[in-house]
Amino acid sequence: MATTERAVRDTATDTLVEKSRDADVVSGGHLVAKALKAEGVDTIFTLCGGHIIDIYDGCLDEGIRIVDVRHEQTAAHAADGYARQTGKLGCVVTTAGPGCTNAVTGVATAFRSESPILHIGGQSSLTQHKMGSLQDLPHVDMMTPITKFASGVFSTERVADMVSMAARECFNGQYGPSYLEIPRDVLDREIPISEARIPKPGSYRSSVKSIGDPADIEKLADMLVNAKRPAVLLGQQVWASQGHNEAINFVRSLDIPAYM
């Protein structure tokens, strides 16, 4: 209990103090940026909000481009489009309350389209939890049905670790979005960098791709051979498995129309 009370007291005061210039300490927002950079993210799509301001400071320091749009739905769709076109992790960052709810349609689209995007959302401070604070909503509960992974982060020491975990889930098995809620005081708080858990990039992500069921492949071949006017509809899995060149050769060899 004493440890919990001390942590809450620390987050409350750390939000108000001027940020340190000591290279041996790091804020939660800067840990977000470091973790995103380790995941290969070079751009975030966002609409500026007070709950997430320290993430922007971290992104500037890490050389991550900030695309500030006029509505969070645009930011979510942009992150989705970025992921589809590049094959990399798309990232949308929203403030608490309406910032999160405005992004729901874009995240739901990514979920149904199997697009790997990471949605990072702000939240009111832990010290104001369940007190009806500014723009306080149950974001995790709302995002759970339309994401593969949805969680809150309640410790600055775990920020980078949780960002990496959420990013991993975007690419684990069937691709899709993840949601991570980070309270304002967790982002603002500074800790010794030695206490932060920062996973090494690429050391934990699955790289194994399973092959299709041979029986299904045989069935598909029979359908194509016997079809009078065949056409092929290619899904997101073609991009996810990096099989686009094979798909192109396939439809060209059969000389049939294809749609992606």
Segment roles from a protein language model:
Residues 2-260:
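N-terminal alpha/beta PP-like core and its mobile active-site loop of ThDP/TPP-dependent enzymes
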